[in-house]
Every structure is written in structure tokens, then in C-alpha cells.
Amino acid sequence: MLKFLSTKCKQFNSLNHIIKHKIYFPSKSNKSYFSSSVKDVEKKNKEPIIQLTNDAINKMKEINLKYKNSKALKVCVEAGGCSGFQYSFSLIDKNKIKDKEQIVYDKDCIVVIDKQVIDILKNSKIHYINNLISKKFTIENIQNISSKCSCGNSFDIDFV
């Protein structure tokens, strides 16, 4: 859920308005879409909402090897950061995915996103950076960005 920041009240309310009217709900016939079966997810989601680079896929394979193929990558977007909004990543159990979350299957990993932020993250790309400075997942090509912070995790959105 997006957190309220008083300094970004207008943008936050606009984002909620956009999210409220463009939210994606899978049909009731897609009950298996939220099951813990990776094969069901693969069949239901042929067009991924988010792309993953090979580095990101390989990192998730490495993580799932360690955790016996039980983890999914959760992407969150919330109000905050230097530029207005920020994204973060966490690992969640595949069998604890909630109905308010959307599953995106891409090759050998599962990415989970709150349904509220699908339009913000649609057509973006998750990458994994592994260098001397940091080891982390990042998101590239987020649509409608008006500005970005040098930290790479914070951005502002143009509300159309």
C-alpha cells in the first residue's frame, strides 16, 4: 500500500486516482492464477508485464536454489524517497501470495507486484547489478517518469 507523505499530497492523491481507475483484476475463472503452482502461473501469463534481464533471472535462480524453489521477488512502489516515489524489493514465499498482488512469470522466476502499481511498472525491466559498489535489483524503463534521483531508487511521475 502506498504511504502518505504530506510533502507529496497532490501527487499521491493523483496517483491513487490513476491507480483506482486503471487497476487490473484477473477474471474469476483464473483462480489458479494465484495458486502456488508455477506451471499454472506460466500458462495464465503469456505476456509478462515486467521484463527481467538475464542477470536478474540468474540471481533469482541462485536464490531459489538456496531456498528450494520457494521464493518470489516482490516489487513495491510507495510514496517517499528523494523524488516522490520509491521502489523496493523483497523475497516472499510463493505460497503466500495475496489476492491483491499480481504474479508475473518470466522464464524461471516469479515476480509479484501489488495490483495498484501495475500501470506504473508496466513495460519496465528488472535488472540485477553485481559490482564493487553494490549488489542489488534495480528497475529500468519505468513509464512516465518526470525526474529520477541519483540514488536510482527514487522517481517522480508525470500525471497525465
From Swiss-Prot:
Q: Which Gene3D superfamilies match?
A: HesB-like domain
One CC-aspect GO term: mitochondrion
Q: What is an annotated GO biological process for this record, any one?
A: iron-sulfur cluster assembly
Q: Does the keyword Iron apply?
A: yes
Whether Nucleus counts among this entry's keywords is no
Q: In which pathway does it act?
A: Cofactor biosynthesis; iron-sulfur cluster biosynthesis
Instruction: Cite the Pfam families for this sequence.
Output: Fe-S_biosyn (PF01521)
Which GO molecular function terms does the record list? 2 iron, 2 sulfur cluster binding; 4 iron, 4 sulfur cluster binding; iron ion binding
The family database entries (InterPro entries) matched by this protein are listed as: FeS_biogenesis, FeS_cluster_insertion, HesB-like_dom_sf
Q: Which UniProt keywords apply?
A: 4Fe-4S, Iron, Iron-sulfur, Metal-binding, Mitochondrion
| Cell location | Mitochondrion
The family database entries (NCBIfam families) matched by this protein are listed as: iron-sulfur cluster assembly accessory protein
Q: Give the function comment from the record.
A: Participates in iron-sulfur cluster formation (ISC) pathway for iron-sulfur (Fe-S) cluster biogenesis. Can bind iron and [4Fe-4S] clusters. May function as an iron chaperone.
Q: To which protein family does this belong? A: Belongs to the HesB/IscA family.
Give the quaternary structure. Tetramer.
Under the heading PANTHER family, the entry gives: IRON-SULFUR CLUSTER ASSEMBLY 2 HOMOLOG, MITOCHONDRIAL
Q: What is this protein called?
A: Iron-sulfur assembly protein IscA1
Species per Swiss-Prot/TrEMBL record? Plasmodium falciparum (isolate 3D7)
Q: What is the lineage of its organism?
A: Eukaryota, Sar, Alveolata, Apicomplexa, Aconoidasida
